[in-house]
């Protein structure tokens, strides 16, 4: 007697999954350029959260820190220690860059997991983490590439390019290729992990909308934090490597 309703529910779940679309974007025309509006919206939300948190952190600091001040100081110390471990004693100027990368990616990843997808209706596509878009992750990876080239050239001048023929000129093509594989690996690792996590949650919510997706969502939060840490650690390691001149 209950076979037909169960079959209908199963078919409905499969139909909901068939509606999950990848690569659907809501576009804005800005100055003759076509931009992904949902990426800009969520990026602005992330930037607003970070700027608001920074304003709160520096407002009225106490000699005896409050719980909130302790939290912000812990975050700063964590970023400083991460940068120092990878870059070395000349880490100071790079703390803002590595910190910005880590915090932007961390909050972006969490925004995709915590921000209700249906709370804002868009003509096409849905809100998602900025790091769910390959354009964002490629831009972050290219910024990292510019940063480690700048670090190497600032430290060594034109002598920085001598690393391409070390330890032997035979490795010149491989060393040049490495400069292309670094941003590729950074961008695709971050993009793939965040996209896969959000798709898994969407599919599970379509099938079993109550209890089952919750553990996966918590796992996604953990994975999102790990991906931000990996990106920031590798960015700092590349900068330190360019300044030291060894692999």
From Swiss-Prot:
One of its GO terms (molecular function) is proton-transporting ATP synthase activity, rotational mechanism. Disulfide bonds: none annotated. The chain crosses the membrane at residues 38-58, 95-115, 134-154, 199-219, 220-240. Keywords: ATP synthesis, CF(0), Chloroplast, Hydrogen ion transport, Ion transport, Membrane, Plastid, Thylakoid, Transmembrane, Transmembrane helix, Transport. Its main location: plastid. It comes from the Eukaryota. InterPro entries: ATP_syn_F0_a_bact/chloroplast, ATP_synth_F0_asu, ATP_synth_F0_asu_AS, F0_ATP_A_sf. Coiled coil: none annotated. It is found in: Plastid, Chloroplast thylakoid membrane. It is a multi-pass membrane protein. F-type ATPases have 2 components, CF(1) - the catalytic core - and CF(0) - the membrane proton channel. CF(1) has five subunits: alpha(3), beta(3), gamma(1), delta(1), epsilon(1). CF(0) has four main subunits: a, b, b' and c. Belongs to the ATPase A chain family. NCBIfam families: ATP_synt_6_or_A. This is ATP synthase subunit a, chloroplastic. It comes from Calycanthus floridus var. glaucus (Eastern sweetshrub). The lineage of its organism: Eukaryota, Viridiplantae, Streptophyta, Embryophyta, Tracheophyta. The gene is atpI.
């Amino acid at each position: 007697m209950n076979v037909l309703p169960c079959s209908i529910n199963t078919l409905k779940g499969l139909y909901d999954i068939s509606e999950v679309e990848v690569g659907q974007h809501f576009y804005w025309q800005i100055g003759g350029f076509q931009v992904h509006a949902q990426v800009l919206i969520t990026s602005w939300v992330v930037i607003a959260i970070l700027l608001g948190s920074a304003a709160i952190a520096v407002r009225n600091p106490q000699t005896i820190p409050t719980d909130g001040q302790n939290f912000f100081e812990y975050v700063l110390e964590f970023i400083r220690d991460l940068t120092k471990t990878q870059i070395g004693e000349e880490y100071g100027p790079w703390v803002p860059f590595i910190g910005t990368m880590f915090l932007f990616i961390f909050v972006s990843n969490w925004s995709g997991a915590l921000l209700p997808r249906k709370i804002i209706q868009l003509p096409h596509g849905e809100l998602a983490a900025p790091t769910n878009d390959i354009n964002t992750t490629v831009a972050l990876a290219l910024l990292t590439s510019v940063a480690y080239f700048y670090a190497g050239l600032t430290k060594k001048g034109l002598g920085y390019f001598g690393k391409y023929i070390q330890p032997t000129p035979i490795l010149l093509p491989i060393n040049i290729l490495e400069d292309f594989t670094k941003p590729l690996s950074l961008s695709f690792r971050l993009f793939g992990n965040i996209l896969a996590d959000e798709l898994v949650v969407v599919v599970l919510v379509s099938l079993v909308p109550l209890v089952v997706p919750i553990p996966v969502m918590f796992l996604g939060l953990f994975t999102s934090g790990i991906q931000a840490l990996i990106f920031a650690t590798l960015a700092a390691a590349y900068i330190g490597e360019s300044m030291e001149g060894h692999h």
